[in-house]
Amino acid sequence: MSIKIENLEKHFGSFHALKNINLQFKQNQLTALLGPSGCGKTTLLRIIAGLEFADSGKILFEHRDVTDLSAKDRGVGFVFQHYALFQNMTVYDNVAFGLRVKPRKERPSKEEIQQKVTALLKLVKLDWLANAYPNQLSGGQRQRIALARSLAVQPKVLLLDEPFGALDAQVRKELRRWLRDLHQELNVTSIFVTHDQDEALDVSDRIVVMNQGQIEQIDEPNQIYHAPQTPFVTQFVGDVNVFHGHIDEGNLVIGEFSHKIDPATNTTQPVNNQSATAYIRPYELTISRHADNALATGKITHINAIGFIVRIEIESAQSDQPIEVILTKAAYSQSQYKVNEQIYLVPDKLNLFQQMNI
């Protein structure tokens, strides 16, 4: 089922939580609402669910206006960050709960409930824990049971609010992979909220990046990472080094350094005499012992050679923050850079935002 949001506004007192949100969720797609705390992503999810109501605007489920309907009349499944399982019920009874409390005319038979619950427990790969209680499960297992319980009532839309936020890093990684595979089997429109960029990039078909109650960019994960459209998205999704300067005759000038901008690798056409900010990924910077076409100079302060890449930190007068460069082990072995060595930085690619774009 597709979902359409039209001109949505929401205030909490004087706080403007959502500002004219217009958005479409395609049928059977897994969409991430990504952004920092307070950006409005959870408020938007709760309004879609019917747990909150907008001040103005519309919510359409497959062209049906559900703006004023309660949560129980919208046919959505909701998974919270903190499981919300019934502690006095077994795993089986938790999953069966939504089916058992349906109105008598809609309630499946005991046999149908048993078949449905058994199938769902197999789907989440926890059928062997049917008779266990929540306090006997790990955090990851509890969240999978919470998801199975939401799916039991066959929701038209599945909504997940930071579903892995309470779990440790390794379990989160495992469940991300599991959720991605599971969604391909389910054929249900799913929306999940996260502040974790890796989670959004790894799991979703599409990402909606939000900031201060507004949508910054809507795109596929690859485009969000490699072709961010605003300075906020550029800095929020992935690591970047930031350099402030101005444009002069097709060059980015930072202090005494003038870097010739290559139109083939720069994301925007430079405009003369404009202030500009360059965002450069750590792997898009080259370290050199020569000043040719350099953007900055600095001193190496730290080298981390653990793993299959080498991370090098550099202090530079041309940047407000320490600069990070990522090299392959082979490139590092050839160059043999040392801590306290003075080097130059040459960008392979610039993501440039000029004053008129900011």
From Swiss-Prot:
Membrane-topology annotation of the record: Peripheral membrane protein
Enzyme Commission numbers on file: 7.3.2.3
CDD domains: ABC_CysA_sulfate_importer
Family matches, as InterPro entries: AAA+_ATPase, ABC_SmlMolc_Importer, ABC_transporter-like_ATP-bd, ABC_transporter-like_CS, CysA_C, Mo/tungstate-bd_C_term_dom, P-loop_NTPase, Sulph_transpt1
Superkingdom of source: Bacteria
SMART domains, sorted: AAA
Keyword match Ribonucleoprotein: no
Domain ABC transporter: 3-237
Keyword rRNA-binding: no
Subcellular location: Cell inner membrane
Cellular component GO terms held in the UniProt record: ATP-binding cassette (ABC) transporter complex
Annotated GO MF terms: ABC-type sulfate transporter activity; ABC-type thiosulfate transporter activity; ATP binding; ATP hydrolysis activity
Catalytic activity: sulfate(out) + ATP + H2O = sulfate(in) + ADP + phosphate + H(+); thiosulfate(out) + ATP + H2O = thiosulfate(in) + ADP + phosphate + H(+)
Sequence positions that bind ATP: G35, P36, S37, G38, C39, G40, K41, T42
Top-tier EC class: translocase
Function (record text): Part of the ABC transporter complex CysAWTP involved in sulfate/thiosulfate import. Responsible for energy coupling to the transport system.
Subunit details: The complex is composed of two ATP-binding proteins (CysA), two transmembrane proteins (CysT and CysW) and a solute-binding protein (CysP).
Family label: Belongs to the ABC transporter superfamily. Sulfate/tungstate importer (TC 3.A.1.6) family.
NCBIfam families: 3a0106s01
Name of protein: Sulfate/thiosulfate import ATP-binding protein CysA
Organism: Mannheimia succiniciproducens (strain KCTC 0769BP / MBEL55E)
Lineage of origin: Bacteria, Pseudomonadati, Pseudomonadota, Gammaproteobacteria, Pasteurellales
